[in-house]
Curated annotation (Swiss-Prot):
The keyword Nucleotide-binding applies. The gene is acsA. CoA binds at R196, G197, G198, K199, T316, S530. Catalyzes the conversion of acetate into acetyl-CoA (AcCoA), an essential intermediate at the junction of anabolic and catabolic pathways. AcsA undergoes a two-step reaction. In the first half reaction, AcsA combines acetate with ATP to form acetyl-adenylate (AcAMP) intermediate. In the second half reaction, it can then transfer the acetyl group from AcAMP to the sulfhydryl group of CoA, forming the product AcCoA. Mg(2+) binds at V544, V549. PANTHER family: ACETYL-COENZYME A SYNTHETASE (PTHR24095), ACETYL-COENZYME A SYNTHETASE 1 (PTHR24095:SF14). It is an enzyme of class 6 (ligase). Keywords: Acetylation, ATP-binding, Ligase, Magnesium, Metal-binding, Nucleotide-binding. One of its GO terms (molecular function) is ATP binding. Belongs to the ATP-dependent AMP-binding enzyme family. This is Acetyl-coenzyme A synthetase. InterPro entries: Ac_CoA_lig, ACAS_N, AMP-bd_C, AMP-bd_C_sf, AMP-binding_CS, AMP-dep_synth/lig_dom, ANL_N_sf. Its EC number is 6.2.1.1.
Length: 654
């Protein structure tokens, strides 16, 4: 990609109200610019001062940044701390009885847990893990429903220095096995079932299936939380019930004091080569990013009630459910269910009931709720809201305006946040009391984040032209490496084209005349479906694993609810099916992908051809397939196409 023309033109702008600005922690654009200047002029002391102010250290650090082995950066590396201590223990003296979590189950039952109670539960479970032989540096895979126990598990791992790797509960047995195998996990923590939308979904059965596959032999124990009355198949000697494990365990557990650069967790994200990437985050740098961005981006105040709707299986649930809110001593809502069960007013009812003041959700959820009409939110008292946020993908301006007017009543700033699994915390977003917002733009980088848009040579592109989004200086919460694959880390994020100097985000973007950033999409073959990144190669590999399939190529096309829909172009081993036969095979392949990877990756559209469009060198012409998927006129040069006759076949929907 050199540069791209920007198609989206948005001129509407919304400044923070005088009342909001007056009460904001960072108030007015001058305050924002002052922080940016401070970071630009004294970069290391800027981050060092924040780390000293916000983190409780067992042993203070003496050096802020070691970049001698760039791009393997080390921050605060001689400091000693514990993430769980920073999220729990340090709040007990003044806020032991403050509510930490308001958990609402799928059926509406509400459980409130104080910081004191959460600390007790974490210590007991941490001691339980220690009784299973889990020690500092061991990897624990977490395959749990959204709930208090998921947070307890993650915090317990952090407390004893174990490295957690949370796997989204919708992933298949094969995906769970792949992550167990790559991490070398010794323990899996799961539940017998999860409950979503009134339906029980088996989790332990999926773990059992994963552990029966080759490559999962490292697992010694499976801890099972009994979420429902449903049973679970049992392997004596390996499986242990959660309630039995914590029985009689001490309610105190001394934290394992960790080096600042010791790994806190691994979170797997999709890669364009098919093999998931184990994104490894450090203890201190990651914690600082989550902690500080939470208070800045959401203008957090001690009496706020925060609700992030993300699952802990994704980075948003790590940074803005498990770590950011708790490190700030916040009260937050955690929700097990879905926004449309038992009816489409569920989100609004919960905001009213729990007096939520900061609401952070995905554009996918907003778009799905828009389809149900504007009357529904108006039936609820949403006056407690003061900040709205979006995450996971760019939000289209129309959805932004609906969110702003219908949900926020035209008084709540919207923080459209751009960041990634790899960045660990928010990078570009409006500070709500300082920056005027524009529908569809994530606006300006946070102070201390040196973001830019460049062409293939690394030169800055002019406003209105698209290019590569890069971050030019290291920052504390940046991914440290890809687990067990440092070469892939360098090649993916610090490529030779930029002399290894810039972090390449993998997104294209442009800047407008005010310097605001507008995200345009992915530059690689990773799809963004409902805010979740899915590798095309993983889906293609799953399709080709079906005995009927010879070859497959997967691309995305715009979808009004999910952001992107999965479109698969498939060549069968037998003849190209047509009519009802094609529909039958397509249905079978969709179910196959759902089983192999998870429902989230299920193709929305499958097209059959006798072949795929390839260059004479055998390379699949994916840009051509994207045009076909979108129903666009083919304008690409097809002179190098080996088999132009198959284009007509692939343009025919079922």
């Amino acid at each position: 990609m050199s540069t791209l023309d920007s198609i989206l033109k948005e001129t509407r702008s919304f400044a923070p109200s005088e009342e909001f600005r007056r009460k904001a922690s960072i108030s007015g654009i001058e305050a924002y610019h002052a922080l940016c200047e401070q970071a630009d002029d004294h970069y290391l002391s800027f981050w060092g001062d924040l780390a000293r102010e916000l983190i409780t250290w067992k042993k203070p650090f003496s050096r802020v940044l070691d970049d001698s082995q760039a791009p393997f950066f080390k921050w605060f590396d001689d400091g000693v701390l514990n993430a769980s201590y920073n999220c729990l223990d340090r709040h007990l003296a003044a806020n032991a009885n403050k509510i930490a979590i308001i958990f609402e189950a799928d059926d509406g039952e509400v459980t409130r847990v104080t910081y004191s109670e959460l600390h007790r539960r974490v210590c007991q479970f941490a001691n339980g893990l220690k009784s299973l032989g889990v020690k500092k540096g061991d990897r624990v895979v977490v395959y749990m429903p959204m709930g208090i126990e998921a947070v307890v598990t993650m915090q317990a791992c952090a407390r004893i220095g174990a490295i957690h790797s949370v796997v989204f509960g919708g992933f298949s047995a094969g995906a769970v096995r792949d992550r167990i195998q790559d991490a070398g996990a010794t323990v899996v923590v799961t539940a017998n079932e999860s409950v979503r939308g009134g339906k029980n979904v088996p989790l332990k059965a999926t773990v059992d299936e994963a552990l029966a596959l080759e490559g999962a032999e490292s697992v010694r124990h499976v801890v099972v939380y009994q979420r429902t009355n449903g049973g679970a198949d049992w392997t004596d000697g390996r499986d242990v019930w959660w309630h039995k494990l914590i029985e009689g365990q001490s309610e105190a557990c001394e934290p394992e004091w960790m080096g600042a650069e010791d790994p806190l967790f691994i979170l797997y994200t999709s890669g364009s080569t098919g093999k998931p990437k184990g994104i490894q985050h450090s203890t201190a740098g990651y914690l600082l990013g989550a902690l500080n961005s939470f208070r800045w981006v959401f203008d957090y105040k001690p009496n706020d009630v925060f609700w992030c709707t993300a699952d802990v299986g994704w980075i948003t649930g790590h940074s803005y459910v498990c770590y950011g809110p708790l490190a700030n001593g916040a009260t937050q809502v955690i929700f097990e269910g879905v926004p449309t069960y038992p009816d489409a007013g569920r989100f609004w009812k919960m905001i009213e009931q729990h007096k939520v003041s900061i609401f952070y959700t995905a554009p996918t959820a907003i778009r799905s709720l828009i389809k149900l009409g504007s009357d529904l939110p108006k039936q609820y008292d949403l006056s407690s809201l003061r900040v709205l946020g979006t995450v996971g993908e760019p939000i289209n301006p129309e959805a932004w305006i609906w969110y702003y007017e219908t949900v926020g009543g035209g008084r709540c700033p919207i923080v459209d946040t751009w960041w990634q699994t790899e960045t660990g915390s928010t990078m570009i977003a409006p500070l709500p009391g300082a920056i005027a917002t524009k529908p569809g733009s994530c606006t300006l980088p946070l102070p201390g984040v040196i973001a830019d848009i460049v062409d293939e040579s690394g030169a800055q592109v002019e406003p209105g032209r698209g290019g590569f989004l890069v971050i030019k200086k290291p920052f504390p919460s940046l991914v440290r490496t890809i687990w067990n694959d440092p070469e892939r880390f360098k090649k993916t994020y610090f490529p030779d084209e930029f002399d290894g100097k810039y972090y390449l985000a993998g997104d294209s973007a442009h800047r407008d005349e005010n310097g605001y950033f507008w995200i345009m999409g992915r530059i690689d073959d990773v799809l963004n479906v409902s805010g979740h990144r899915l590798g095309t190669m993983e889906i293609e590999s799953a399709l080709v694993a079906n005995p009927l399939v010879a070859e497959a190529a997967v691309v995305g096309k715009p979808h009004e609810v999910k952001g992107e829909a999965v479109v698969a172009f498939v060549v069968l081993k037998g003849a190209r099916p047509q009519g009802d036969a094609a529909k039958t095979v397509a249905a079978e392949l969709k179910n196959w992908v759902a089983h192999e990877i998870g429902k989230i990756a299920q193709p929305d559209d499958i097209r059959f051809g006798e072949n795929l469009p390839k260059t004479r060198s055998g390379k699949i012409m994916r840009r051509l397939l994207r045009s076909i998927a979108k129903g666009e006129e083919i304008t690409q040069d097809v002179s190098t196409l080996e088999n132009p006759q198959i284009l007509q076949q692939l343009q025919q929907p079922l």
